[in-house]
């Protein structure tokens, strides 16, 4: 069967459902796909089609995630939903499914719970920029005042993690009752069912509140170097995949990492043995550089638009440590541990100086399966920025995955 061509007519946005276990994330995901299908978007997905999510690997870690897609009048959405709490932690830290925004699902009957707070904290630290709240199970709350209290509590919780709690849209409803109405009448329209209207309202708010992200090609140029060779009489070629932005022949770029930053001019671009005038995000390209010797550049360095990224050695990161069953360590590790940090295209040795718990206390050791904040000092400077992902490796196997939350030095 021929694959459907992906029609790119509307702007694309990546979102996901986050929140405490059993507050209704998957039910809401199913209700959204069916509500958008009723409005004339793509086909709906039932609860069990979403819940039986396949495993995928990101940075050597197995994660269960369900991906669904749907359309509103103005946008195309890719939506990720994870069945288990550990899958969320792993997904958000590895960036397996990047989120431009999230729908935080909170049960109106229970209010914010420990995982609600943990997901908000993670969203903040891994750089999920915007959150819209769905206050679920409204039908189970008899007292209107109780719902208002939960609304206030969620807003305060969001504000305490530096999200704009007062501005964030909070839509109350019942994902289950909406899903039941949609299952009995898949063509239901606006104004025909109170609960389905709440789902329509939620997505109208997601459309208007979550901004369309900048496209990768509009960002500043960055490419991690994978390989280097020299062409006699022409100069040195660095190959790699353009991570973001665009680069043109004749442009000045910086070479960053390990040693002092150098500036070079791009004298040629090649892809699949053909020359290009310009290369864009996603291209695997050879970049010909003038005035640079083969010894001056190596795998793991990056080429970037001048002044946009700087080399650093010390940072704070949010890290998930693999369990033994996931191929991780069998034993805990302590401050002073020196593994390899695999960043973009290469390993750099680093020392873990300290661990910090969510409460801000210093921890003395980390067990396999833990999520922890740590301070790392690398032995060589490399190009680092907030939100950058990395893997922690020891003897060739992945023992953890992390995301940079702040740069210290």
From Swiss-Prot:
tr-type G domain span: 10-214
Localization terms from the record: Plastid, Chloroplast
Sorted UniProt keywords: Chloroplast, Elongation factor, GTP-binding, Hydrolase, Magnesium, Metal-binding, Nucleotide-binding, Plastid, Protein biosynthesis
UniProt-annotated binding residues for Mg(2+): 26
Catalytic activity from the UniProt record: GTP + H2O = GDP + phosphate + H(+)
Chain intervals for the UniProt region annotation (G1): 19-26
Keyword Flavoprotein: no
Pfam families, per the entry: GTP_EFTU (PF00009), GTP_EFTU_D2 (PF03144), GTP_EFTU_D3 (PF03143)
UniProt entry tagged with the keyword Chloroplast: yes
CDD domains referenced in this protein's UniProt entry, alphabetically: EF_Tu (cd01884), EFTU_II (cd03697), EFTU_III (cd03707)
Stated name of the protein: Elongation factor Tu, chloroplastic
Location of region: G3: 81-84
Purpose of the protein: GTP hydrolase that promotes the GTP-dependent binding of aminoacyl-tRNA to the A-site of ribosomes during protein biosynthesis.
Family indicated by similarity: Belongs to the TRAFAC class translation factor GTPase superfamily. Classic translation factor GTPase family. EF-Tu/EF-1A subfamily.
Region (G4): 136-139
A GO MF term: GTP binding
């Amino acid at each position: 069967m021929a694959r459907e061509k992906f029609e790119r007519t509307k702007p694309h946005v990546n979102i996901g459902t986050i929140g405490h276990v059993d507050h209704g994330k998957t039910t809401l995901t199913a209700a959204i796909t069916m509500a958008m299908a009723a409005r004339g978007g793509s086909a709906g997905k039932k609860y069990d089609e979403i819940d039986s999510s396949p495993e995928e690997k990101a940075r050597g870690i197995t994660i269960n995630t369900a991906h669904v897609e749907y359309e509103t009048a103005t946008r195309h959405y890719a939506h990720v939903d994870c069945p288990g709490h550990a899958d969320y932690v792993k997904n958000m830290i590895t960036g397996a499914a990047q989120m431009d925004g999230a729908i935080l699902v909170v049960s109106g009957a229970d209010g914010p719970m420990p995982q609600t707070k943990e997901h908000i904290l993670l969203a903040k630290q891994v750089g999920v920029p915007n959150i819209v709240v769905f206050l679920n199970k409204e039908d189970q709350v008899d007292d209107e005042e109780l719902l208002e209290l939960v609304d206030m509590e969620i807003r305060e919780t969001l504000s305490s993690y530096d999200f704009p709690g007062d501005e964030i849209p909070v839509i109350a409803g019942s994902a289950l009752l909406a899903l039941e109405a949609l299952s009995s009448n898949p063509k239901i329209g606006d104004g025909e069912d109170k609960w389905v209207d709440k789902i329509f309202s939620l997505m109208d708010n997601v459309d208007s509140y979550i901004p369309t992200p900048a496209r990768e090609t509009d960002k500043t140029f960055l490419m991690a170097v994978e390989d280097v060779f020299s062409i006699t009489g022409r100069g040195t070629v660095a190959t790699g995949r353009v991570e973001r932005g665009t680069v043109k022949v004749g442009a000045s770029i910086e070479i960053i990492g390990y040693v002092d930053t150098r500036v070079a001019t791009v004298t040629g671009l090649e892809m699949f043995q053909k020359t290009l005038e310009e290369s864009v995000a996603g291209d695997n390209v050879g970049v010909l550089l003038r005035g640079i010797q083969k010894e001056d550049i190596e795998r793991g360095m990056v080429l970037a638009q001048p002044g946009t990224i700087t080399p650093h050695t010390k940072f704070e990161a949010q890290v998930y440590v693999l369990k033994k069953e996931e191929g991780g360590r069998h034993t805990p590790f302590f401050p002073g541990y020196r593994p390899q940090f695999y960043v973009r295209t290469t390993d750099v040795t680093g020392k873990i100086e300290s661990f910090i718990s969510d409460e801000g206390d210093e921890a003395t050791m980390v067990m396999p399966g833990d999520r922890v904040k740590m301070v790392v000092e690398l032995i060589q400077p490399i190009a680092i920025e907030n939100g950058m992902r990395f893997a922690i490796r020891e003897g060739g196997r992945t023992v953890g995955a992390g995301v940079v939350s702040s740069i210290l030095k």
